[in-house]
Amino acid sequence: MAELIIVYFSSKSNNTHRFVQKLGLPAQRIPVDNRPLEVSTHYLLIVPTYAAGGSDAKGAVPKQVIRFLNNPNNRKHCKGVISSGNTNFGDTFALAGPIISQKLQVPLLHQFELLGTATDVKKVQAIFARLKHHTHDKQNKPTT
């Protein structure tokens, strides 16, 4: 099977980290500090949203994630994005996902609130399995 992992960012609050732990999938965390991370395999990106709500989308994508995605090698391996947020912030709920999806031209696969629910965990596990299978099929497709 093709290798596929979760790459995620979680602040010191660890909300996203706790969600990723529930998935039980191979994962790498984008460091909170300025240490670089480079991945050399396909991945799904899980990212929280840092927007204030209303029409203020500034800062929705964490700076660490921007820094990570500024590396062309990291960008090319991203197969999709999943974002979290807080519905109390209205229109900016989980906005980091659509922003990254548009910039990288990858699918926005799911959005969840705060720590996510058991249903969110199952959905993301299913998305991961489907994408891993699809990635495997593409890599093993005979050339004509």
From Swiss-Prot:
GO terms for molecular function: FMN binding. One of its GO terms (biological process) is protein modification process. It holds the Pfam family Flavodoxin_NdrI. InterPro entries: Flavoprotein-like_sf, RNR_Ib_NrdI_bac, RNR_NrdI. It comes from the Bacteria. PANTHER family: PROTEIN NRDI (PTHR37297:SF1). Probably involved in ribonucleotide reductase function. Belongs to the NrdI family. NCBIfam families: nrdI. This is Protein NrdI. It comes from Streptococcus pyogenes serotype M4 (strain MGAS10750). The lineage of its organism: Bacteria, Bacillati, Bacillota, Bacilli, Lactobacillales.
